[in-house]
Structures are given as C-alpha cells and as structure tokens.
C-alpha cells in the first residue's frame, strides 16, 4: 500500500499504539523516520527504537513506547508541515510548544533536531511536528 505522508503515518501509529497501551509499535524504516525517532528519544518521549530487516529489504523500525505510571508520556503528537502545505520558519519564528513544555521537531540543513537545538545552532527549517 502506498502512503502519501510516511512521517505522518509513523506519528499516527505511535499515537494509536499509545492509546491502546501497547509497549511497542512498528513502522516501515526510512532515514527521516529514524532521525525523528532519534530526537524523540533524546527528548525522553520514547524508550528507544531498533531497525529490523524485513524480507523486502526495506526494513522496519520497532519503537519502544514510554509510559509514566500507566499514562503515555506523549500527550499530543501533531504533524505541522504536510505534503500539501509545507511550513518553513526562520530561527526567530520557531514556535514554542505549550510555553516550552513541548518540543517542535525541525528539519534543518544541519539535520533533524529539536526547536531548542535549532535555536542554539541559529538555523531554521521545516517544522515537521510538535510533541507534548
């Protein structure tokens, strides 16, 4: 099955798995998805992930979800820049998610990073998603 928005598909899989209380969720592998998962792991929103090879050679990312006292750590996961409407922002315009309690994930020329990292590196880019 063809997916128009692979990153949006992965975020939806994570959101749905947490609503069901699953400990892990799988998603087809890609570099962008892995980079976003690296940021989520560094910010403490997921336990981690591992890449497993599949028969078709694409690979699969198995994501370990994180809970605190039975409640999902990720309360809100929103896709900002979509295939039909890309959202780019300069460093000074990067959004603050829930007054700094959440994180925006930005794709910059220096790689995929959190909004705080992008501000400290003084780079802007495409706002992929927000996490709270």
From Swiss-Prot:
One of its GO terms (molecular function) is rRNA binding. InterPro entries: Ribosomal_uS8, Ribosomal_uS8_CS, Ribosomal_uS8_sf. GO terms for cellular component: ribonucleoprotein complex; ribosome. Keywords: Ribonucleoprotein, Ribosomal protein, RNA-binding, rRNA-binding. Pfam families: Ribosomal_S8. GO terms for biological process: translation. Gene3D superfamilies: 3.30.1370.30, 3.30.1490.10. The keyword RNA-binding applies. Belongs to the universal ribosomal protein uS8 family. Part of the 30S ribosomal subunit. Contacts proteins S5 and S12. One of the primary rRNA binding proteins, it binds directly to 16S rRNA central domain where it helps coordinate assembly of the platform of the 30S subunit. This is Small ribosomal subunit protein uS8. It comes from Cereibacter sphaeroides (strain ATCC 17025 / ATH 2.4.3).
